[in-house]
Amino acid sequence: METPLLVGLELRCPPHLFNTHSRPSSSLSIPALSLRILTPTAATTSSAVIELPANVAEAPRSKRHSNSYLARKSAISEVQRSSDFLSSLQRLATVLKVQDLNVILRDFGISGRWQDLIQLFEWMQQHGKISVSTYSSCIKFVGAKNVSKALEIYQSIPDESTKINVYICNSILSCLVKNGKLDSCIKLFDQMKRDGLKPDVVTYNTLLAGCIKVKNGYPKAIELIGELPHNGIQMDSVMYGTVLAICASNGRSEEAENFIQQMKVEGHSPNIYHYSSLLNSYSWKGDYKKADELMTEMKSIGLVPNKVMMTTLLKVYIKGGLFDRSRELLSELESAGYAENEMPYCMLMDGLSKAGKLEEARSIFDDMKGKGVRSDGYANSIMISALCRSKRFKEAKELSRDSETTYEKCDLVMLNTMLCAYCRAGEMESVMRMMKKMDEQAVSPDYNTFHILIKYFIKEKLHLLAYQTTLDMHSKGHRLEEELCSSLIYHLGKIRAQAEAFSVYNMLRYSKRTICKELHEKILHILIQGNLLKDAYIVVKDNAKMISQPTLKKFGRAFMISGNINLVNDVLKVLHGSGHKIDQVQFEIAISRYISQPDKKELLLQLLQWMPGQGYVVDSSTRNLILKNSHMFGRLLIAEILSKHHVASRPMIKSRPEQKFRCK
């Protein structure tokens, strides 16, 4: 007798026990079973397959639920529907178990009842009815709306062993990744490991997914992959797919090739998504030879390139400058029905225009419009930018106006493109209209928007408006461009807006970057001109060694004449400390100011006592002025100090500039 072989089994299970969205039933059916029996002989012929009826085991059988089960299910439903769920919860607290409360918590999250979810979670905490699933679900739902609150919930977990539960950790790490906070995510992950977390494959897949979204995510991804063997984790197809996507987004084609080979060695079969990432990595340098080899390899193993791969191949050809082959491939995309939207046309138009082939790009644009290809305006944006680069501002302006009419709502990229075209064409009215349109559509300006406007306002000599726009840009957290700010500082100085110029300088200075030394000197001249000597002193104090000697001398004399008298000694010490040689004129002006204000006696005495130790002495005319007024400062003390000056002056070769400035 031949032994039958079981080759097919289908099991249909009943709904979840506490699925409150399903209709309650008083009976529970036995799962339907469908079997196909094959004998060894029948394995060679399809006619020998014997298939049993699917309803062979479907004898109805009733099952009574316990009173406890029915009470809990009713309580769940009542709390979910209640307008005052906390009161219902308090009344039914003895009936509901932790798992029941978790069902309600998840229902609140799915329904978007965020405030109710938080209140329920806090109630569960207060009553000690909480589990790993509670924390994991709550963090997941709260983190989708407020990552800071999710972190607060995680940090509030009192039990250390619960805090490093892998499911809870994965939930909070996923929240951080989805909110673009990879650095914070990695720091928290490192802390979790120190506290005893045993990460699993989900943990690493979550972190690797975050590396795709950030600049220079490749080194961090490699570091994470290096941890896998230590944690007993092997890379699977999903993880390889993520790593290949990271390689592609960072232009690491050789590394992507190595990972593909490693996959094959480990017994994984790369699929079309893995190959798509490898192909994308070739697009960075336009390596069309390797791209063609890859396409040939794929076809040889039966993989048919999809829309994404063919579009990526088009990108490779364009980057490699193969425009004839790009046109041929675009035709193939059209034939396959893969060019129903504007993206492949835009890629080719952009490549042609940047290669100086504007008319060919225009031809593609007109062809696309003629075929009625679906467009969101991105193609218009490409052409407007191309026309601006070729200084064909009139055509760019006309196309921008056409775009405004055609597309009622535009994205920020398109708005910036049209704004730039109007600015380049000098169309102030259109510029103002575009800014109003952005406000009406609640579109927040980005770095490019601000840069375009500031440059335009400077060109139109609207320097205070350019300054105000720079303030707005800085307040939004955008990084200021030094060259543009330097130009604005210069023009603000020319219109005697010295305080505004200093404000722009400070925004640059405090943006955690090194600025060119010429800018320190430029702002110093502007501040001296505006008699903003206290601000000028700050510039000199922080950057004296990067400022030329003539400019330091100019600042020193200006400060001695009209700067804050209480800072005179400090200024002289800063100038000396920078290597600047202070001349007698500056000392004479400072001493004359002190003598004219007897209440500054201590400052005069401090200056006179400091000078000999640094190699400075008063000249004869200044000495006579001091002696003449010595009764105000103490004759004996003045005589003692001046005697030290006399002793220090003996080895010196006295020199005196011809021109002297005296205070009136």
From Swiss-Prot:
Please name the GO terms of the biological process aspect recorded for this protein, alphabetically.
chloroplast organization; chloroplast RNA modification
Q: Where are the PPR repeats?
A: 165-199, 200-235, 236-270, 271-305, 306-340, 341-375, 376-406, 411-445, 446-480
The main location is plastid
Q: Which GO terms describe its molecular function?
A: mRNA binding
Keyword Plastid set for record? yes
GO CC annotations on file: chloroplast
Arranged from A to Z, the UniProt key words for this protein are:
Chloroplast, Plastid, Repeat, Transit peptide
Cross-referenced PROSITE patterns, in alphabetical order?
Answer: PPR
A Pfam family assignment: PPR_3
Q: What domain of life does the native source organism fall in?
A: Eukaryota
**Location in the cell:** Plastid, Chloroplast
Q: Where is the transit peptide?
A: 1-72
Which cysteines are disulphide-bonded? none
UniProt lists the family membership as follows: Belongs to the PPR family. P subfamily.
Q: What is this protein called?
A: Pentatricopeptide repeat-containing protein At1g10910, chloroplastic
What species is given as this protein's source?
Arabidopsis thaliana (Mouse-ear cress)
